[in-house]
């Protein structure tokens, strides 16, 4: 299970939480964490910088344009050397047969080939690659005609009418194409001599509205209605989560964890990757790793502890005193950096000895 903070939207906010370790709860109500003061993104070394300081080159690829979430301002400050959006990816001019677009957006298969092209180019220059890719093929809208009514997997339902099922089939076809593209990517990496780890995750579930305005989740009885006010913590945790996969072209890279299952989250996946790769980390990321052991998700809507147990909030969670002290320490460190006198901010960017 991969716990998220949003349902149906919020990709840029989730990226900021994953790559930098901050959430909306760390700031005042209504604060957009993608549009903070520019220097806020330089208080701590971000996840990519844990790798670039060891000789990696960090690049971001996005299958759409650069208009969303202030990425062109914030991402360079998080350690990315280059940002490649749709037009930049197409300008790479790598060998490709077939169409570039699937439905309304760039095909995942084409996008992954671009990532392979960038990895090979970076490796050939003598560097290792930290690549962060954001695919788009299965993004909303889910209009029935999006994929020309194609659905490679048969699906039926006793709860949904044919018009609603046409929408569901669009999402299912997008998932199928993503799965096939991931298979092509891992097949290519099997043939690569470069030791490579792939982290593949869905940042949030789609809203997937049906013809009458209800979501598919309401129709299938997974929640009482579209308004989360009446949902239980268990319902929120279920629908505010997706799946994730960590794969490597050499099982030894997974440190004996190949084939295992482990709950993770938007804020826990970074520390999890750092642990797997044995990367030298700063005190800030060491703190986030410890926090992830007691807290997978903490938002205004719900809280999930380190075992995957949801609660309505941190106050209601069955946490030990030590766990609460750890959460308070994280809060204090961030407050000092963002609003205080930065008494310990520099020290938090020092490597763990």
For the regions a language model picked out, list residue spans one by one.
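Solvent-exposed soluble domains appended to multi-pass membrane proteins
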Residues: 1-353
């Amino acid at each position: 299970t991969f716990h998220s903070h949003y349902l149906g939207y919020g990709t840029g906010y989730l990226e900021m939480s994953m790559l930098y370790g901050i959430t909306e709860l760390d700031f005042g109500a209504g604060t957009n964490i993608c549009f903070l003061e520019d220097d806020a993104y330089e208080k701590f070394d971000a996840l990519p910088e844990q790798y670039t300081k060891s000789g990696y080159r960090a690049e971001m690829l996005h299958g759409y344009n650069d208009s969303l979430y202030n990425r062109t301002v914030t991402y360079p400050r998080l350690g990315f050397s280059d940002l490649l959006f749709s037009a930049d990816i197409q300008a790479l001019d790598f060998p490709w047969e077939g169409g570039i677009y699937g439905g309304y957006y760039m095909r995942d298969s084409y996008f992954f080939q671009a990532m392979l092209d960038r990895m090979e180019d970076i490796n050939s220059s003598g560097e290792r690659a930290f690549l962060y890719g954001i695919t788009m093929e299965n993004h909303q809208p889910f209009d029935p005609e999006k994929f020309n009514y194609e659905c490679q997997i048969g699906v039926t339902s006793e709860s949904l009418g044919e018009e609603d099922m046409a929408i569901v089939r669009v999402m299912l076809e997008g998932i199928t194409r993503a799965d096939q593209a991931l298979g092509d990517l891992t097949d290519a990496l099997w043939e690569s001599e470069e030791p490579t780890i792939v982290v593949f995750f869905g940042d949030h579930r789609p809203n997937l509205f049906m013809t009458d305005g209800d979501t598919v989740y309401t129709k299938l009885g997974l929640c009482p209605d579209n308004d989360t006010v009446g949902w239980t913590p268990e319902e929120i945790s279920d629908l505010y989560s997706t799946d994730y996969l960590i794969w490597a072209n050499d099982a030894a890279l997974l440190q004996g964890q190949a084939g295992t299952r482990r709950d993770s989250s938007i804020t826990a996946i970074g520390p999890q990757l750092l642990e797997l790769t044995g990367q030298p980390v700063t005190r800030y990321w060491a703190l986030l790793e410890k926090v992830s052991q007691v807290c997978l998700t903490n938002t205004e809507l719900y809280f999930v502890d380190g075992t995957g147990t949801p609660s309505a909030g941190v106050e209601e969670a069955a946490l030990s005193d030590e766990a609460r002290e750890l959460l308070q320490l994280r809060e204090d460190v961030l407050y000092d950096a963002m609003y205080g006198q930065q008494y310990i901010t520099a020290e938090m960017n020092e490597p763990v000895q």
